[in-house]
């Protein structure tokens, strides 16, 4: 990948990423209890928690917002999520299906003062792109030729793979989002689940 993007080792399996752009940005926060590991990752890079200025959330699933409240308090960073998913993060709406059970088992402390993404989708030099389907307000990000895919897709054995249907809010809407994102210019795909890999024209195999 590029020298200014890092997959955080402590979140392997459901990756959070650091972006060294105009400001330092964290994409997603992992499961409950992974926040301390993320702080240790920062320390290993000679960084202080307060160096992180923004936390961008791809979607409301517990394995992506589980350490959000902890890291908000530790870093003082500004929190961003989609207006569609913010009510789920605050607990004002229940997650559907199996996700409701998961959120009941994995109790998550609620963050405060979440900002919805700007209409133009710009956070500094990062572009937020609406890609609903996995959740109603799922968002991907593009920075410097890298797509931060969240759970729009996953990777497995060096290939792009679809998300499991039973985990998606709406499969047909997700398919539309795959078509949409394939029209954007990027070289690398950084998923939450699976390892980063080069695009190499594989997206069309998913829709």
Task: Enumerate the predicted regions with their spans.
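Short alpha-helical
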Residues: 14, 33, 62-63, 87, ...
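Metallo-beta-lactamase
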Residues: 32-33, 85-130, 136-201, 206
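Residue-level marker for buried hydrophobic side chains located in beta-strands
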Residues: 25-27, 56, 79, 146-148, ...
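Pre-active-site segment of Zn-dependent metallo-hydrolases
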Residues: 25-54, 99-113
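Active-site metal-binding motif and surrounding structural segment of the metallo-beta-lactamase
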Residues: 35-81, 118, 188
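Conserved beta-strand hairpin/beta-sheet module of binuclear metal-dependent hydrolase folds
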Residues: 1-45, 140-152
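Short hydrophobic/aromatic-enriched beta-strand-loop microsegments
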Residues: 76-83, 150-151, 167
């Amino acid at each position: 990948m590029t020298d200014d993007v890092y997959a955080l080792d402590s979140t392997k399996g459901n990756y959070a990423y650091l972006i060294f752009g105009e400001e330092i940005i964290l994409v997603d926060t992992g499961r409950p209890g992974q926040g301390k590991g993320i702080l240790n990752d920062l320390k290993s890079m000679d960084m202080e928690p307060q160096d992180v200025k923004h936390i961008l959330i791809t979607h409301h699933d517990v394995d992506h917002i589980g350490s959000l409240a902890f890291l908000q308090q530790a870093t003082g960073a500004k929190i961003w999520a989609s207006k569609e998913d913010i009510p789920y993060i605050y607990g004002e709406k229940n997650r559907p299906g199996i996700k409701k059970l998961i959120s009941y088992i994995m109790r998550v402390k609620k963050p405060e003062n979440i900002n919805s993404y700007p209409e133009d989708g710009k956070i500094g030099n990062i572009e937020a792109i609406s890609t609903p389907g996995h959740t109603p307000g799922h968002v991907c990000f593009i920075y410097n030729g890298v797509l931060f895919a969240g759970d729009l897709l996953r990777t497995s054995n060096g290939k792009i793979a679809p998300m499991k249907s039973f985990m998606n809010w709406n499969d047909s809407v997700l398919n539309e989002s795959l078509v949409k994102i394939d029209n954007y210019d990027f070289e690398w795909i950084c998923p939450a689940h699976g390892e980063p890999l080069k695009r190499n024209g594989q997206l069309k195999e998913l829709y």
